């Protein structure tokens, strides 16, 4: 069995100097006879039998202790490792060859890889569209800002011109107001009241045709109108029934004429200079004037 697992070139037996089987039969035997028989027979193996096998066994035992696996001895004296022994590892360890499962990623299928590829393409397209839309919005914003500033400058120039014209009209109106205030002060007061009054807008379809009973003007605070109806009511009342200190004094010529007439008739002149008609002292002969008027139609009949 040992020679069966050995290498092909390692099972050659050592050659001896004598060849017993190749001896020439025609050779003449030696005179002594014994010496010739030893040379031509098995005499050449005497040294091998005398202790040669023991030396080989000792060497085999020593090598079997030091070597790994099952050593196989050869007749030639060499040994080869067993074919069933494990192969020595390169790194010198006996751990696992593959990395741990935590470090190994999950194996992705074909559908998952295709989905990831399609998703990456969709995300790139979406990002590109967002960048284009952002650039478009910024461009439109710049154009809007430019147009807004141009329009604002134009409005400012127009407002300046209109304000100058309104200021001229206002100054002329103030001069006219102060010139005519002492002559017709009630008219001047009525002109101070604003005529253009903003109406209250109410929500709802039913309130469109209805108008508020009180018209108000917007006050200094937004959303809180100022009510001027009471002011108008007081001014109208003062116009129709002015107090004594607001009554106009009579002209100087009318006052003098009234004083003279009063002195002649013996009646005092009124304060405002008006002259009352003189009452007739003559009484009708037939009684009261009312009775005379009643009798006149009867006489005509």
From Swiss-Prot:
Coiled coil spans: 111-147
Principal subcellular localization: membrane
Segments of skewed composition (Pro residues): 243-252
Biased composition regions of type Basic and acidic residues, renumbered to the chain: 200-212, 291-301
Keywords: Coated pit, Coiled coil, Cytoplasmic vesicle, Membrane
GO cellular component: clathrin coat of coated pit; clathrin coat of trans-Golgi network vesicle; clathrin vesicle coat; plasma membrane
Disulphide connectivity of cysteines: none
Subunit structure: Clathrin coats are formed from molecules containing 3 heavy chains and 3 light chains.
Function, in words: Clathrin is the major protein of the polyhedral coat of coated pits and vesicles.
Protein name from the UniProt record: Clathrin light chain 1
């Amino acid at each position: 069995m040992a020679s069966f697992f050995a290498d092909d070139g390692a099972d050659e037996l050592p050659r001896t100097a004598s060849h017993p089987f190749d001896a020439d039969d025609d050779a003449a035997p030696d005179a002594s006879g014994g010496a010739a028989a030893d040379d031509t027979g098995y005499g050449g193996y005497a040294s091998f039998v005398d202790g040669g096998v023991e030396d080989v066994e000792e060497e085999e035992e020593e090598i079997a202790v030091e070597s790994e696996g099952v050593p196989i001895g050869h007749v030639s004296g060499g040994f080869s490792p067993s074919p069933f022994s494990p192969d020595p590892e390169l790194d010198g360890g006996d751990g696992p060859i593959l990395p741990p499962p935590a470090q190994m990623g999950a194996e992705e299928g074909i559908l998952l890889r295709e989905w990831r590829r399609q998703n990456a393409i969709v995300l790139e397209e979406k990002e590109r569209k967002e960048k284009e839309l952002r650039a478009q919005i910024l461009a439109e914003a710049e154009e809007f800002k430019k147009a807004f500033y141009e329009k604002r400058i134009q409005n400012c120039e127009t407002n300046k011109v209109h304000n100058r014209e309104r200021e001229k009209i206002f100054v002329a109106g103030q001069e006219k107001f102060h010139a005519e205030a002492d002559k017709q002060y009630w008219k001047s007061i009525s002109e101070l009241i604003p005529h253009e009054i903003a109406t209250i807008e109410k929500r709802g379809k039913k309130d469109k045709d209805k108008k508020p009973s009180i018209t108000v003007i917007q006050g200094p605070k937004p959303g809180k109108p100022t009510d001027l109806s009471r002011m108008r009511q007081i001014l109208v009342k003062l116009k129709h029934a002015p107090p004594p200190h607001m009554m106009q004094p009579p002209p100087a010529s009318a006052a003098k004429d009234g004083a003279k007439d009063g002195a002649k008739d013996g009646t005092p002149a009124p304060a405002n200079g008006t002259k009352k008609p003189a009452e007739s002292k003559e009484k009708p002969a037939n009684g009261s004037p009312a009775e005379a008027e009643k009798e006149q139609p009867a006489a005509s009949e």
